[in-house]
Amino acid sequence: MHISALNSFLDFKKNYLTDKNSKIKIVEIGSQSINESIKNHLDKNHMYTGVDIVKGNNVDIVLDDPYKLPFEKDSIDVVISISTFEHTEFFWLSYLEILRILKPTGLFFLNAPSNSKYHRHSSDNWRFYPDSSKAL
């Protein structure tokens, strides 16, 4: 994980994950840890599940289908995706699945590069700009 992505997540956590008393269900999509993980920065009341399409550090569930998340509708408080959407062929299918599992008051933290160089990690399909977030 790039330091800028980690810092963005830490800002998100500081501003939005402020409840220290309630159990907060967090799902990270693309959770395989290469050099740093958000899991290391979560609080004791955060119930973390990491999902990815490959086995690895911080991967609790290996997905058979990257567009089907194994969670009930409206069951997750927070979904996090850091540097994953650019590698997802059909990111809009992932987005719809995220909306399905999020509680109505749930939060989605998306961090995706807009100006990084080509970096094929199975594939490199998209770049996201500020208007992308508004459109989603």
Question: At which residue positions do the language-model features occur?
Answer:
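Short, well-ordered alpha-helical scaffold segments within catalytic/effector domains
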Residues: 6-10, 95, 130
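Conserved SAM-binding loop
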Residues: 22-119, 131
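Short, solvent-exposed loop/turn segments at secondary-structure boundaries
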Residues: 120-124
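Short alpha-helix
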Residues: 125-136
